[in-house]
């Protein structure tokens, strides 16, 4: 499968790095998209190569989506093309994994009403206001959406996402 990550500078390092390598380990092709090509750097200094700009992404070419957290989603959600990519993939039922602040992009896409999910507690009210039944649990699976709260939930998050991809 081809899996797309949408992110930007100040991502939460382990929330991007762990799933990136975990999914590659499963044999998937993994791509990172951001505002421009080059590298993006996490909150703790880890840098990753950007494969595509948001404008270069054709969501029809990807099978699943990962939205890591940190401060990056606050920036990504302001990019109309990135939000449209997330909206299209989510509404088409493609597997989508979010953690921490990652759901902010889906909130901006307007696709979460009536869904069950979790996130970093700091955006709990935003999730509830978007129509999510917010659950304080390490991982919540609702159809094509797998959500988790923070780095302490990484193993459960990827365990459930990998199951969904099979």
Curated annotation (Swiss-Prot):
Biotechnology: Being able to prevent acrylamide formation at 100 degrees Celsius, this enzyme could constitute a viable and unique enzymatic method to reduce acrylamide formation in food, whose presence is a worldwide concern because it is carcinogenic, reprotoxic and neurotoxic. The use of deglycases is not likely to affect the quality parameters of foods, in contrast with methods which lead to depletion of the components (asparagine and sugars) responsible for acrylamide formation. Moreover, deglycases can be used directly during the thermal process, which avoids a time consuming pre-incubation step.
Annotated signal sequence range: none
CDD domains: GATase1_PfpI_like
Active site per the UniProt annotation: 100-101
Temperature-related activity annotation: Optimum temperature is 84-97 degrees Celsius for proteolytic activity. Thermostable. Displays a half-life of 19 minutes at 95 degrees Celsius.
Localisation per UniProt entry: Cytoplasm
All residue ranges annotated as the PfpI endopeptidase domain in the record: 1-166
Catalytic function, reaction form: N(omega)-(1-hydroxy-2-oxopropyl)-L-arginyl-[protein] + H2O = lactate + L-arginyl-[protein] + H(+); N(6)-(1-hydroxy-2-oxopropyl)-L-lysyl-[protein] + H2O = lactate + L-lysyl-[protein] + H(+); S-(1-hydroxy-2-oxopropyl)-L-cysteinyl-[protein] + H2O = lactate + L-cysteinyl-[protein] + H(+); N(omega)-(1-hydroxy-2-oxoethyl)-L-arginyl-[protein] + H2O = L-arginyl-[protein] + glycolate + H(+)
Alphabetical list of InterPro entries matching this protein: C56_PfpI-like, Class_I_gatase-like, DJ-1/PfpI, Peptidase_C56_Deglycase
Top-level taxon: Archaea
Assigned GO CC terms: cytoplasm
EC number: 3.5.1.124, 3.4.22.-
UniProt keyword terms in alphabetical order: Cytoplasm, Hydrolase, Protease
Gene3D superfamilies attached to this UniProt entry: 3.40.50.880
Chief localization: cytoplasm
PANTHER family: DJ-1 PROTEIN, DJ-1_THIJ_PFPI FAMILY PROTEIN
Role summary: Deglycase that catalyzes the deglycation of the Maillard adducts formed between amino groups of proteins and reactive carbonyl groups of glyoxals. Thus, functions as a protein deglycase that repairs methylglyoxal- and glyoxal-glycated proteins, and releases repaired proteins and lactate or glycolate, respectively. Deglycates cysteine, arginine and lysine residues in proteins, and thus reactivates these proteins by reversing glycation by glyoxals. Thus, was shown to afford full protection against glycation of thioredoxin by glyoxal.
Subunit structure: Homooligomer. Exists in two functional species: the predominant form is a homohexamer that comprises about 90% of the total activity, and the minor form is trimeric.
UniProt record similarity statement: Belongs to the peptidase C56 family.
Name of the protein in question: Deglycase PfpI
Species for this entry: Pyrococcus furiosus (strain ATCC 43587 / DSM 3638 / JCM 8422 / Vc1)
């Amino acid at each position: 499968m081809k899996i797309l990550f949408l992110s930007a500078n100040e991502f939460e390092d382990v929330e991007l790095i762990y799933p990136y390598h975990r999914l590659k380990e499963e044999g998937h092709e993994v791509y990172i998209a951001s505002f421009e090509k080059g590298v993006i750097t996490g909150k703790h200094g880890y840098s990753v190569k950007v494969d595509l700009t948001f404008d270069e992404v054709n969501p029809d070419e990807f099978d699943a989506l990962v939205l890591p957290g940190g401060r990056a989603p606050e920036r990504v959600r302001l990019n109309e093309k990135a939000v449209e990519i997330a909206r299209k993939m989510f509404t088409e039922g493609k597997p989508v994994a979010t953690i921490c602040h990652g759901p902010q992009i889906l909130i901006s896409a307007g696709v979460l009403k009536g869904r069950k999910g979790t996130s970093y507690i700091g955006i709990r009210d935003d999730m509830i206001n978007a129509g999510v039944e917010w659950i304080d649990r390490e991982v919540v699976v609702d159809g094509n959406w797998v959500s988790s709260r923070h780095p302490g939930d990484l193993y459960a998050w990827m365990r459930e996402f990998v199951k969904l991809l099979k």
